[in-house]
Amino acid sequence: MERGTVSRIEVEIVKEMARQISNYDKVLEIVNQKDNFRSIGEVPLIPWKSTALSHGIPGICMLYGELHAHFPEEGWDDIGHQYLSILVNEIKEKGLHTPSMFSGAAGIGLAAICLSQRFTYYNGLISDINEYLAETVPQLLTEFDQRQVCMSDYDVIEGVSGIANYLLLFQEDKAMGDLLIDILKYLVRLTEDIIVDGEKVPGWHIPSQHQFTDIEKKAYPYGNFNMGLAHGIPGPICVLSSALIQGIKVKGQEAAIEKMANFLLEFSEKEQDSLFWKGIISFEEYQYGSPPNAVNFSRDAWCYGRPGVCLALVKAGKALQNTELINIGVQNLRYTISDIRGIFSPTICHGYSGIGQILLAVNLLTGQEYFKEELQEIKQKIMSYYDKDYIFGFHNYESMEGEEAVPLQYVGLLDGAVGVGLGVLNMELGSKTDWTKALLI
């Protein structure tokens, strides 16, 4: 079978998914089934949150926006408009509670932009979102400077790295540009050294009381340093680097990027010729001044592990015009694709679709087709999860404690069918909207 035929089949599968998702009542019925509510340890898995980009309507809007951009005569924008109307009603009823990318205003704004046909429509909604950001983000930045750091202060999921990547779309808007500068200055300050238990450490140190779970609080009594793209310093690296590449610069920005990138390299673990990264470096490991003695990481994914870290290194290398960093990122991505570990889902966050988007991003950043064959392999892995008897086509798979991976019926961008669909479209046709901004790409 010729590749063109395969491509048409894969795109048609995404279109069929989009047709099935068009019935909102059916979506709610499926995602809210009892079996979808699980926990990993003390962390509950959230199958649906209507206003959240991670698990709700904004991601669905992105899918229809992207489909319309590729197939403008097929009516996908009409379905997207219906969903955006539902989303606006949900906001009116429940309000906005966070400016973040994956739970709040920035993600909603980005979804509206993806449907807007290059700002032709929905400018009123986008303006309202931006006004909300202009009101809330400065208050948060002031609060951050008055206490110890939380991951959700700076990360892409809940923090200002995600918001900043949204603001990069508004270079001509003075208010949004000024807000972006304030965030960049905060991220630079985050790299200044602080004193913890008599030890000088980087300012992105997360104290014990600000860990996500009680288990982590007990495991890291002196705190730690997060190394994942979703919650760690690769996120700020990506944002600071993207801004620099776009010509947006604040004092200390280059030094901040370099300091964080060097930290990633210093606390990597070498196995033969490949580098690995744990999700977390403990305070004690930092004190010893060396990487951990044993490779101990959870997976090779967008959220944690080699792919996300390598994306950050390549972005840093391009921003700093440092070919060594670019080469380290590219080479270790190659090693990763030849030996992917801990991945058993087709999704974005910790699945094959997320890896695929990073490979595409690195190709675009470098202007080289480093991963042409590897992208075909990743796409084949994603399609191997397609279930023609499942209404949304692709399950999310999660590994519960003591269990094998179980299929879950998720729809959202991070862990659901929408993220798989958008990823496949990008790998087949390229991206015509800005949905990948959510991933720091």
Swiss-Prot record:
Summary of the function given for this chain in its UniProt record: Could be implicated in the processing or the export process of the subtilin lantibiotic.
BP GO terms, sorted: peptide modification
Taxonomic source organism: Bacillus subtilis
Pfam families in the cross-refs: LANC_like
Family: To S.epidermidis EpiC and L.lactis NisC.
Protein name (Swiss-Prot/TrEMBL): Subtilin biosynthesis protein SpaC
